[in-house]
C-alpha cells in the first residue's frame, strides 16, 4: 500500500462523497489482537480532534482500572473504506495511536513504541527501515453452526492450482479486496501444506508495513468467512505438515541509498549489513518470545518442516535463521525467517530493528555463513561451528528474553513487563493441561 498523505479536509470530503456511515478506529494490543471503537460518522469531528476516549483497563497489557482513560489519535493517512461494506452502510477505517490524558503517547501502545525505536534509528543516521512480510495462513471448513472444523478445504501442495487448490477462488477474492484497499499485491499461491496459502504484498516503511499486516489479517479472515471457510494464522494447526511463517525481509536506508548494498563489498554487502546481521544473531534468543509468542509457535520451530531452529546465516540456503536473498541494489535485504503470523508485527519489528542497531552500534562481527543444510548436521557438528539453537518452548524463550538487554530496550519497560507477565500465565496454564496425546500414550500403559 503506497504511502499517502491526507488532511482533515480530505477525510471530510471522502466521508461525504462515499456516503460513509460508520468509522472504525483501530489499534492493536500487546498480544497482536486488533481492537476497534466503532462510531457513527456523525462523530467525525470529534474523531478528527483526537477526542475519542476509551477504557484502557479493558485491553490486554494496557493499564489498571484506576488510570483507564485513553484517547485515540487517528493517523489520517490510514483512511480506507472496507469494500465489503458497500451494500450495508459503508464503514471507513482509521488506524490510531493511543495517547494518555496528559497528551503524551502511551508507552504500552505497540505502534507508538515502534515509532520510538525508529527515532533511535534516525539518531544513528538512517532515514528508513523497510519491511516486506510473507504471511502464510490455513483455510479450514466451517460446520453447520459456523464454527471452525479441523477439515482442510483442500489437499493441494506448493504452487498447485484448481481443481487441487480449492482455496483458489477465496484467495483470489482476498487479493481483489486488498487491491481495492490500495495494496500492491506481488504474488499469491498455494503453500506446501494442504489448505495453506501465501499472499505477498509490496514492502513499505516500518509502520505502514505493520499496519498492512494487521489489515491483511482482517481482510483474510473476513473474506474467508464469506466462502464458508475459517482462516487461521495459528503457526502450527496440524501435526505432520509445514507450519505457517511470516518471514520478515528488512532493509535500512540512508536517504535514497540502501545501507546494506555495496557493489564492491563481499557478497555486495556493506559493513552495516554484516553488523546488522550480527546483532540479529546475537539477540535472536532474546527476541524469539516476541516473534514466536504463543505455545503453538514452537511446534513449528522443529527440524524437518522448513522452519529455522538454529541461529546462523547464509547467502544461499534456507535452513538458517537469517538468509540474504540474491537481489541487490535497492532491493538488498536481510530475511529473518523465524517470525510467525501470531506475532504482534509492531513489537516483532521493533525487536529485530533494535537487535540490528545493537550490532551496528557495537560494530559486531558476523560469524562465517553456513551454506550446508543445518538440519543434516548433528549437535557436535553444529557446536563445532558455533551454531546455537533457538528456544524450543515458550518457557525457554521467556527465560532468554529476561536475560537479554536488547529486547527490553526494544519494547520499553511497560510492554516488556506486561508481555512477560501475560505469557508466563499462558505457559503456566498450558503446562497444567492434559492433552489427547498423553491420554492415548499413557492411560492404558500405566
Curated annotation (Swiss-Prot):
Domain of life: Bacteria
SMART domains: Gln-synt_C
GS beta-grasp domain ranges (all copies): 18-103
Binding residue positions for L-glutamate: 242-243, 300, 306, 318, 337
Any GO BP: glutamine biosynthetic process
Catalytic activity entry: L-glutamate + NH4(+) + ATP = L-glutamine + ADP + phosphate + H(+)
Major subcellular location class: cytoplasm
GO CC terms, sorted: cytoplasm
Gene3D superfamilies: Glutamine synthetase, N-terminal domain, Glutamine synthetase/guanido kinase, catalytic domain
Binding site for Mg(2+) 2: 136, 191, 198
Activity modulation notes: Inhibited by glutamine.
Function: Glutamine synthetase (GS) is an unusual multitasking protein that functions as an enzyme, a transcription coregulator, and a chaperone in ammonium assimilation and in the regulation of genes involved in nitrogen metabolism. It catalyzes the ATP-dependent biosynthesis of glutamine from glutamate and ammonia. Feedback-inhibited GlnA also interacts with and regulates the activity of the transcriptional regulator TnrA. During nitrogen limitation, TnrA is in its DNA-binding active state and turns on the transcription of genes required for nitrogen assimilation.
Quaternary context: Oligomer of 12 subunits arranged in the form of two hexagons. In its feedback-inhibited form, interacts with TnrA in order to block its DNA-binding activity.
Record NCBIfam families: GlnA
Protein name according to UniProt: Glutamine synthetase
Originating organism: Staphylococcus epidermidis (strain ATCC 35984 / DSM 28319 / BCRC 17069 / CCUG 31568 / BM 3577 / RP62A)
